[in-house]
């Protein structure tokens, strides 16, 4: 949790934040962007390198076609205009894990521009503009700790050098840490649906830098911005922005000036710290990459890529609401991942009542998966099993209590619901009126005090009686029928 500076509520109300995000997404190609080396994560250090990765003299880059297609697909998914011609450029700076002394990126002629993402804000929505999406290569990785002989050494792993990235730069349209969180959540969903990246933040497949400034409410001019780096989760991004906004307001309120700089976020302390002065574009001395021709993505190639653009989360939500009659809230939860949405639709198509399937997937199934740390693909209960269980409860064959117990057994035994249902002797909810009346008479006789309370007007006591009947029937009594019979007996 961010440790916010002591800024008064009135001061916070007088200022508004202006936020823009730069998101780097690692593309899920088998080989690097300018050579054939593997992009596999977790291999031994410096095992996936070649003269191109190492920046050796005479090594020439060859552009990976699949990386271009993935980048175009992502750009289309966030509503960008694809530039038919874009140019690679050298971004010059020194860092130990950048062996060439420059990074091949794109500058004034990027692959795509002028996109947008729609996010929920309050009871409505808001469009966040996308300035640009461009292709570039990743740098290597500096490892600063874990050396037994000295803590002052840094090791360099160049396996990541040359891995293909797209950088997605938003317009400064984001007005709060909450909006930043929603933007990143929606962007991650969209990228996952396209399949161009696994957006795994722990492995560095998605990285985010935040540019933030504050200004008096109503002012058009931007304030001086800072860039916050080293933020490796969406929650930390929100916390870092909350702290930095409060810090900047405090500086301005006390008569100081904001320094344009790069700051690091320390999640343990919940604070940002100055790292270095913020570079401007001219500091990188961009110039066109002489070893690569301009990238041409003509209309025919764009149309080929557009054909493989999948149904995206927002469109899928709208279709599922219309097709299955589920609520917008259900649709939102069920489309958070493409895999979950696919699984739900498979079950919904096989069941009589898709709404019941939605409730079971979100409640009984996802709750147990989360408790055991499992993904939907690891569920012992298949979507056919969910559909089967939904139909059993829909028909009244089993009660919700029986369903919960059978789901528990499925997870304990690692078996699908139909198999466990068979093993348990295909239990049925009891709707035998005469048998239930005998149990009800027994329960009322044993609890005369509660019966008098009911007759005196305390109608909620009926829940106690239902529980007792369900207990004696070992959960197999039809609770709706039990309610009816109890009310009739107690009212007589």
Give names to the regions the model predicted.
Residues 28, 246, 341, 362-370, ...:
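Amphipathic alpha-helical core segments of compact helical bundles
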Residues 203-216, 321-344, 354-372, 390, ...:
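Core structural elements
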Residues 301-308, 315, 345-350, 386-398:
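Extended, non-catalytic structural segments that build the interaction scaffolds
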Residues 377-387, 397-471:
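Strongly charged, low-complexity linkers/loops
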Residues 473-479:
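Short, basic interhelical loop/turn and adjoining N-cap
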């Amino acid at each position: 949790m961010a440790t916010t500076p002591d800024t008064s509520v009135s001061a916070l109300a007088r200022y508004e934040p202006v936020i823009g995000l730069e998101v780097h997404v690692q593309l899920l190609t088998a080989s690097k962007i300018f050579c054939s080396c593997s992009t596999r994560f977790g291999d031994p250090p410096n095992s996936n390198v070649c003269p191109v990765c190492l920046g050796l003299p005479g090594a020439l880059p060859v552009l990976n076609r699949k990386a271009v297609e993935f980048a175009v697909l992502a750009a289309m998914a966030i509503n960008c205009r694809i530039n038919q011609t874009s140019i690679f450029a050298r971004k010059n700076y020194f860092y130990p894990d950048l062996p060439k002394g420059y990074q091949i990126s794109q500058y004034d002629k990027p692959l795509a521009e002028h996109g947008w993402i729609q996010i929920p804000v309050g009871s409505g929505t808001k469009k966040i503009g996308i300035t640009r999406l461009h292709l570039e290569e990743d740098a290597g990785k500096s490892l600063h700790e874990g050396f037994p002989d000295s803590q002052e050494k840094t090791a360099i792993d160049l396996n990541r050098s040359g891995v293909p990235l797209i950088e997605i730069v938003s317009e400064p349209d984001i007005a709060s840490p909450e909006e930043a969180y929603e933007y990143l959540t929606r962007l991650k969903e969209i990228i996952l649906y396209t399949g161009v990246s696994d957006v795994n933040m722990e492995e560095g497949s998605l990285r985010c830098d935040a540019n933030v400034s504050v200004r008096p409410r109503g002012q058009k001019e931007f304030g001086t911005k800072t860039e916050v780096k080293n933020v490796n989760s969406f929650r930390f991004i929100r916390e870092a922005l909350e702290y930095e906004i409060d810090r900047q307001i405090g500086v301005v309120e006390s008569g100081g000036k904001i320094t344009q700089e790069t700051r690091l976020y320390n999640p343990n302390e919940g604070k940002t710290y100055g790292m270095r002065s913020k570079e401007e574009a001219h500091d990188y001395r961009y110039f066109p990459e002489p070893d690569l021709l301009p990238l041409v993505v003509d209309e025919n190639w764009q149309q080929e890529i557009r054909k493989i653009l999948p149904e995206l989360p927002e469109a899928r939500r709208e279709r599922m609401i219309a097709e299955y009659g589920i609520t917008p809230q259900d649709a939102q939860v069920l489309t958070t991942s493409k895999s979950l949405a696919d699984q739900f639709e498979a079950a919904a198509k096989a069941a009589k009542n898709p709404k019941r399937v939605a409730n079971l997937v979100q409640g009984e199934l996802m709750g147990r998966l989360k408790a055991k740390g499992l993904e939907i693909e690891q569920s012992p209960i298949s979507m056919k099993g969910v559909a089967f269980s939904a139909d059993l409860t829909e028909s009244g064959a089993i009660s919700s209590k029986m369903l919960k117990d059978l789901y528990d057994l499925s997870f304990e035994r690692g078996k699908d619901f139909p198999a466990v249902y068979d093993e348990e002797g295909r239990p049925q909810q009891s709707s035998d009126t005469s048998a239930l009346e005998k149990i009800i008479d027994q329960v009322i006789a044993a609890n005369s005090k509660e019966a008098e309370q009911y007759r005196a007007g305390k109608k909620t006591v009926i829940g106690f009686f239902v529980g007792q009947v369900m207990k004696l029937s070992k959960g197999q009594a039809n609770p709706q029928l039990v309610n009816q019979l109890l009310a009739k007996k107690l009212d007589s």
